[in-house]
């Protein structure tokens, strides 16, 4: 709760500062339109030094994410990562009535994949928008026996229980695999998601034929009863678990239910250590469910006589409770040693290793001291003069942006299209993110002005070079015009730059939190740092400014 209150306070303060800066910026923009091109003013540009160094992303809060990863992903640079998850399930209806002479028909688990649809000439095709890798994995589904409690008994009243990506709780307790892996419900030794939609059929008694009545987007949809090919549970399991409990208090209310049936555990394992895939599941979809289908006897009166007919019923559960992702990494030891080496923090690293999930990130310090001894204050004084608390602008910033070049010989081929830069000291986005209203703030296809997608430039010899560009004009104006703190910035990979909700780190020492978009991708990229042996590709803070000709 303290963490949340802190973030809310920081956000409120940030918005206040942003509003003031924006007002000033509008005024300066109007001034700029009058001075550009006049003989008394000219636009110049200069690259200012920055310092960059690596940091490890330690275990983070992984419960109730916007999405849930599942699978195994092998990164040829970093190594392998397995991501499993455990999720609570609750019924849509408590105190169910199953009827008399109940007979189990089927049990079906459905979880949609995160996908995009396109239609051409009445034909709809799908693309999984968060599928990483192209090889099958081993996939198991278990009945979970570990209680995912809602509240932390060691915290203040109503303090939420935090669960972390290494399978631990805030108290330090570990989620034991023996509790997660109770009854095996499903096992596939070679699983890979299908891009095909799923047609649901219903039997039409009049036509005496099955008809398509509904179509689902591509989904993980499996039978968990009487399915010997995938090791479904023994006869009587589902009847004993639910259908025989009609008048039992354990399924009559939420608290008793989540203690009785503690959800499902999805375990992903590699078939080989160098192949696999990872995908994002949409557990918040209305279609994400476990449905127990059954028949029961219903007595009806026809022409004054009672008749018994067989009626179909269903008992549906959804993933409405806690959902926890658990990561298991097998990273290259030499890469980890480089990332964990803090001796380079003072001067900066040669290469920056960015990896999603429980991976790594980099810290950015603007206006770092150069070899001539110029300090942050020296650089800022080029743009302003402060006298008696009053700030006089010497140079008007027209545009400011960071450039990071990809180290293409070290990076793998599957690099992300976007990187995300945020205020590391306050664990919030920078002002430029707020003012960039391109598309939708919640969309992965947004913030193109601030966070420019991966681009390619061609040099004079025809050689292509990949780079990322991040605009920080508003952020720099805040520092110069409002004397705001020149905070440290963090740079991370992201599956969705619209997913900026912070996930608190378990060991929040230097890094307090990371955005959820970083959690939800296994991708990586290696960038040139400020001590790169290729000086032309070292990251730069480029500032275009207008100043009077004296």
Where are these regions (language model features)?
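Secreted, disulfide-rich extracellular signaling modules
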Residues: 2-550
